[in-house]
């Protein structure tokens, strides 16, 4: 099987954000307000057909035409100019032409333009009008490779391209660029999943198609919310031997039926950063034991957090809290398992954000955890155990609702200061904590019942929407 040693790098909607951020930066350096920005798209006409290849003799093919009535049969020859779709080298060779045109437009016209295969994205000042696209079109006419007039999208405050709607209308006022996924893409994914559910059959090929479509959709959602829920598709693609619609797939479908119609737009901050100050520091920990009580194992867990909130010109504010989970509460994870520490660590890491949503809203956070399993699940957005995956879904859903940017980091257990609040019933634990942090005060605590953490998908998702309000910052309306 032939392969190539070259590859290409495609742009995303982030190109528009990069240009917008540069406009903001240079306007600020000049002491001016940011001017309005506009975005437009163009497309090459019959792209693969207009770019020649070095072996045109191989683009001729022959089929046998059967005799019909009095018309004689015989060979019929067809010539396909340019590049053939499906050939490994065709993409690489074709891509050289639009790359060349982008380089020409940038160097001769100072035009902020880039390309995604045969699609061009132009991001320019509103005061420039259509001049950027006119210049790009002129260069293509010089190269005898015209742009497609039917696919031309004039410079505007919002346009559809690369599978999403890119809105730059708030760049100069609020320093924000908004990206929304097209609804028909969401509807297609839901339709395919419902068909598989009704047939109780999801083969690996279909799972791969759905997974690819979901990846594209979620790339334009805040924090790629919902990524965790798509992991049953990966399991089906590579490991499952039974192709029935499993409980994990049912849970995934319920999640996306609630999420996709309410999919949060991606808001990219391109102005002077709201997050210029230091981040909030979070430590969470959990302890778990199953002592014998009257000859019966009684499981119990204690969750703890330690939060450092920076204050400009003042010492940071320190908050701590703990909450106890008895055997009855832990039955939401398992009724028999004697080791539930990973589940409790994930619960602790999510509980801190449920407890103080207004404190964390729109903040950068550095979150320290000493359990590598919980850390991996929260970082990568998936856990193989269903109850862990549900909590990870809940965390990422909450992070999107609060517009959080969380950086997870491992910390050795002996250095995790949340270890003491998570062992608050033990003698001397809190005395040692207050000796280290005399200014720390109790923080809020709210832990939803573990059994309600997305057990049925849509119902509890809507409860999260209701509790935490709009998906997006209140200062900008994207409806």
Feature map (PLM): residue ranges:
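RNase H-like nuclease fold core
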Residues: 274-341, 355
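RNase H catalytic domain
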Residues: 114, 124, 354-418, 423
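C-terminal reverse transcriptase regions that engage the nucleic-acid substrate
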Residues: 156-272, 419
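A short, polar/acidic, helix/strand-boundary loop motif
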Residues: 72-100, 308-347, 373, 382
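Active-site palm subdomain of RNA-directed nucleic acid polymerases
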Residues: 91-139, 352-369
